[in-house]
């Protein structure tokens, strides 16, 4: 069965005019929701993501509660790594921990390839369930970017400064580029499978790329990103790039064959456009504002919307994920305000 969906988000991704500004929030499904916390009392992240019915419920929950214009698949960026031979465990209070960190070219050469239908069928089944039976808004598939995935694989877990990753990049360039190629292959195959299963857009998250300077990005990271976006582009769905703490890289992302440049709060939308970012833009509210009084939130959001609406192709989002402390009612009120305020302004 083919469902009719609200395409406002997709139109904005394509740079088309919309009647109002579409909105969704990174980590909209999860820790701030009482329903989710009850589920986590009984099930681990692994158990939720391996159960298509439960995972679909968690993914859809914020669509029902907040009236957002897109759903994003509930899963972890580390989900595909076991398929290529990475021993990863998500530890409470720590994050991803890898038992066999990459230390050499030989370690890279041991990595395998992903076959999504065999290796992550539960993810594809979740997408199919959501897009054929449950959602009336587009579903966003996603992947971690090669640099962020490589950082976990080299550091063995989260890091404050990623010294080991950058040292490996500088000291072992042959092994580094081999790792980038392996991860680019995995990301391409993984995203294409999500699109084939029903995802209507995809986003690549590069959580730690802000630690890299522009020159190093161009040499060590950008070639893999160019190949990913060029190959996935053939699937015909909008593609979004989002990095954290990387305002110095937005022009590098703009050069990639993608549709939407994601911004965090460190760079105002109008400044990004002044720098030459003319593709669709997504962002860029500091999630900390969600803990402020409503009057403060409203004025801040007006400012963001007024910048974003100056040209077609704008999607409201946060610059990072929703905090656990955020009141779900605030997110519901925020979506309503975004829709109503932007509709009034765009109708003028």
From Swiss-Prot:
It comes from the Bacteria. The keyword Lyase applies. PROSITE patterns: UROD_1, UROD_2. Pfam families: URO-D. It is found in: Cytoplasm. One of its GO terms (biological process) is protoporphyrinogen IX biosynthetic process. Keywords: Cytoplasm, Decarboxylase, Lyase, Porphyrin biosynthesis. Its EC number is 4.1.1.37. InterPro entries: UROD/MetE-like_sf, Uroporphyrinogen_deCO2ase_HemE, Uroporphyrinogen_deCOase. Substrate binds at residues 27-31, 46, 76, 152, 207, 320. One of its GO terms (molecular function) is uroporphyrinogen decarboxylase activity. The record marks 76 as: Transition state stabilizer. GO terms for cellular component: cytosol. It catalyses: uroporphyrinogen III + 4 H(+) = coproporphyrinogen III + 4 CO2. Pathway: Porphyrin-containing compound metabolism; protoporphyrin-IX biosynthesis; coproporphyrinogen-III from 5-aminolevulinate: step 4/4. Belongs to the uroporphyrinogen decarboxylase family. NCBIfam families: hemE. Homodimer. PANTHER family: METHYLTETRAHYDROFOLATE:HOMOCYSTEINE METHYLTRANSFERASE RELATED, UROPORPHYRINOGEN DECARBOXYLASE. Catalyzes the decarboxylation of four acetate groups of uroporphyrinogen-III to yield coproporphyrinogen-III. This is Uroporphyrinogen decarboxylase. It comes from Bacillus cereus (strain AH820).
């Amino acid at each position: 069965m083919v469902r009719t969906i609200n395409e406002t988000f997709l139109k904005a991704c394509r740079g088309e005019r919309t009647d109002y500004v579409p909105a969704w929030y990174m980590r909209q499904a999860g820790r701030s929701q009482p329903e989710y916390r009850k589920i986590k009392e009984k099930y681990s992240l692994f158990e939720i993501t391996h159960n298509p019915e439960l995972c679909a419920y968690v993914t859809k929950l914020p669509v029902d509660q907040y009236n957002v214009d897109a759903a994003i698949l509930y899963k972890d960026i580390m989900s595909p790594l076991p398929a290529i031979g990475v021993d990863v465990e998500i530890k409470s209070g720590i994050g991803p921990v890898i038992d066999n960190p990459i230390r050499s070219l030989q370690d890279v050469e041991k990595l395998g390839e992903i076959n999504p239908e065999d290796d992550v069928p539960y993810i594809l089944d979740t997408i199919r369930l959501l897009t054929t039976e449950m959602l009336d808004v587009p579903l966003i598939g996603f992947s971690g970017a090669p640099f962020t995935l490589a950082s976990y694989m080299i550091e063995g877990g989260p890091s404050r400064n990623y010294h080991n990753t950058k040292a490996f990049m500088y000291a072992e360039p042959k092994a580094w580029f081999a790792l980038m190629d392996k991860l680019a292959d995995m990301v391409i195959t993984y995203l294409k499978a999500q699109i084939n299963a029903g995802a209507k857009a995809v986003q690549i998250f590069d959580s730690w790329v802000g630690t890299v300077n522009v020159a190093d990005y161009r040499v060590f990271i950008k070639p893999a990103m160019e190949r990913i976006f060029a190959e996935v582009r053939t699937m015909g769905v909008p593609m979004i790039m989002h990095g954290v703490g990387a305002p110095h890289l937005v022009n590098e992302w703009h050069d990639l064959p993608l549709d939407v440049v994601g911004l965090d709060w460190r760079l105002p939308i109008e400044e990004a456009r002044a720098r030459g970012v003319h593709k669709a833009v997504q962002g860029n509210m500091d999630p900390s504002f969600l803990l402020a009084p409503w009057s403060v939130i409203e004025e801040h959001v007006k400012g963001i919307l007024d910048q974003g609406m100056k040209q077609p192709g704008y999607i409201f989002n946060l610059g990072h994920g929703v905090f656990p402390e955020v009141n779900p009612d605030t997110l519901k009120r925020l979506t309503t305000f975004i829709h109503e305020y932007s509709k009034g302004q765009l109708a003028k």
